[in-house]
Amino acid sequence: MAEHPDLPPLRIADREFGSRLIMGTGGAENLAVLEEALVASGTELTTVAMRRVDAAGGTGVLDLLKRLEITPLPNTAGCRTAAEAVLTAQLAAEALDTTWVKLEVVADERTLLPDPIELLSAAEQLVDAGFTVLPYTNDDPVLARRLEDAGCAAVMPLGAPIGTGLGIGNPHNIEMIVAAAGVPVILDAGIGTASDAALAMELGCSAVLLATAVTRAKRPPLMAAAMADAVRAGLLAREAGRIPKRFWAQASSPQR
């Protein structure tokens, strides 16, 4: 869905995107359902896990994205060390002819939480190598600042652990990250339903990245459309400016 004409597009590094909903491809039942969901979402940028994709294969995810004119964003999902992540990013650059990468370095398979030490190391190496790095990080304002200082083009704090659907567990930290950031803040992971996506935008995020909330919904295309509307609604509400919260009631019409 196109953004409101009065609102600017999402800008990351030297590129602009009309949609502020970034989709993932993991967990889809099949390519047909994934295609319906991607179209319904209006996304222009979609992540692809390089460890699960054969770039030279036949009609797969990459072919689908090309046909839909959606920019693929390779990610380093499954990597546990900086060395693994850097190698995966380099292979993705060769396979997809892009220096953009969603950087993931997780500490373990149980929590899938980012390993801050390995993540920062990988980010520094990839930025030095000329990559446009979008790191999946903890909801830690200090780490987010370190990643920005390292040269990352955006920071992508989690709302909750990947695939949990728990929503935004620490909204205050997300607000602190946004307040201090000089690059786009993209809420990544933990989204469960449309209200979570709207809240992310109301908190100040520039965009939302999600996969499981759509691909494992009962009706993925319908949920994708809901997420697109929610992201747009949250952004519009933020730009409009909410009323201040009050302890006592205040009539909207004269009482006498």
From Swiss-Prot:
Pfam family, one: ThiG
The keyword Iron appears for this protein: no
Enzyme class: transferase
Binding site for 1-deoxy-D-xylulose 5-phosphate: 163, 189-190, 211-212
CDD domains documented for this protein: ThiG (cd04728)
Localization per record: Cytoplasm
GO BP: any one term: thiamine diphosphate biosynthetic process
Pathway linked to the protein: Cofactor biosynthesis; thiamine diphosphate biosynthesis
Gene3D superfamilies given in the database record: Aldolase class I
Keywords tagged on the record: Cytoplasm, Schiff base, Thiamine biosynthesis, Transferase
Reactions catalysed, as given in the entry: [ThiS sulfur-carrier protein]-C-terminal-Gly-aminoethanethioate + 2-iminoacetate + 1-deoxy-D-xylulose 5-phosphate = [ThiS sulfur-carrier protein]-C-terminal Gly-Gly + 2-[(2R,5Z)-2-carboxy-4-methylthiazol-5(2H)-ylidene]ethyl phosphate + 2 H2O + H(+)
An example Gene Ontology molecular-function term: thiazole synthase activity
Keyword Electron transport: no
Domain of life from the UniProt record: Bacteria
Gene Ontology CC terms, in alphabetical order: cytoplasm
Main location: cytoplasm
Active site: 102
EC number from the UniProt entry: 2.8.1.10
Record text on subunit structure and interactions: Homotetramer. Forms heterodimers with either ThiH or ThiS.
Family: Belongs to the ThiG family.
Biological role stated in the UniProt entry: Catalyzes the rearrangement of 1-deoxy-D-xylulose 5-phosphate (DXP) to produce the thiazole phosphate moiety of thiamine. Sulfur is provided by the thiocarboxylate moiety of the carrier protein ThiS. In vitro, sulfur can be provided by H(2)S.
Protein name according to UniProt: Thiazole synthase
Species this protein is from: Nocardia farcinica (strain IFM 10152)
Gene: thiG
